[in-house]
Amino acid sequence: MKNLILAIESSCDDSSIAIIDKNTLECKFHKKISQELDHSIYGGVVPELAARLHSEALPKMLKQCKEHFKNLCAIAVTNEPGLSVSLLSGISMAKTLASALNLPLIPINHLKGHIYSLFLEEKISLDMGILLVSGGHTMVLYLKDDASLELLASTNDDSFGESFDKVAKMMNLGYPGGVIIENLAKNAKLKNISFNTPLKHSKELAFSFSGLKNAVRLEILKHENLNEDTKAEIAYAFENTACDHIMDKLEKIFNLYKFKNFGVVGGASANLNLRSRLQNLCQKYNANLKLAPLKFCSDNALMIARAAVDAYEKKEFVSVEEDILSPKNKNFSRI
């Protein structure tokens, strides 16, 4: 029976392929190859290198799941938003595969995929708030009863995850910065450094991390010799202030929207400090908290495959001749 959907994810620096049963939501195959070590020496993602590594990794993974090809009913691929050259690597492969196997092609918005990471093995729930925090995005969404999405808040500049990467780079700690900063903060012996919470007295429902990032830079410049203890102290102050900022704005949003269900997705949602605070916030407002599994917080093809299951039912197919690359499109209005 042809009931399997193969999905490809290559929006940034993770190459991933997954195969899901559209009837049972059972994962038949999932593989992910990270490029973190390859980019770490540059302190961030190099697009051209990412594209080359995708072109090497994706064919290898396809060979590993070839046994399932005879049961495929569709090919899905991330087409927006992301790095152009990275997206194109996955799209080109998806189009080739769809054409060769004579299967429908399903483009999937990467951010929508993250939302589906909450529902990998179950039907999607509606009427809930969602915090999406990653290396490229920071936003709060309202998933309404009619499956429409309303953007409640987004960042005016840097994202939550991006700010961790940049602070780590300032202190020559490596890439990616999220886990490095989090682990360093846990080892802080001194806690005398503090930073102002961004937009603390603003009623605007928005995030901003550029000012905090600059405050960290100025603090680093005060120290001629940045020893490990000082780095840990700065990491602790930065992480807590960044989390304070997220929680401050979420508190305002909860007061306005009275969510009974709240989901958290994206690579940066793996931060344990943030997760703990979110649990406390939802307890305070008597809301059910749904967290994406740690294994599937970061970019992966299984969330794309899961989103494609619902897209398949709606027949959201495109021609392999159609230009579906949309690297900057963050506007998605429905699930």
UniProtKB/Swiss-Prot annotation:
Coiled-coil spans are none
> What is catalysed by this protein?
L-threonylcarbamoyladenylate + adenosine(37) in tRNA = N(6)-L-threonylcarbamoyladenosine(37) in tRNA + AMP + H(+)
Q: Which InterPro entries match?
A: ATPase_NBD (IPR043129), Gcp-like_dom (IPR000905), KAE1/TsaD (IPR017861), Peptidase_M22_CS (IPR017860), TsaD (IPR022450)
Q: What is this protein called?
A: tRNA N6-adenosine threonylcarbamoyltransferase
Keyword annotations for this protein? Answer: Acyltransferase, Cytoplasm, Iron, Metal-binding, Transferase, tRNA processing
Which Pfam family is one of those matched by this entry?
TsaD
* UniProt: Fe cation binding residues: 110, 114, 299
* GO terms for biological process, alphabetical: tRNA threonylcarbamoyladenosine modification
Taxonomic lineage from the root: Bacteria, Pseudomonadati, Campylobacterota, Epsilonproteobacteria, Campylobacterales
Q: Which organism is it from?
A: Campylobacter jejuni subsp. jejuni serotype O:2 (strain ATCC 700819 / NCTC 11168)
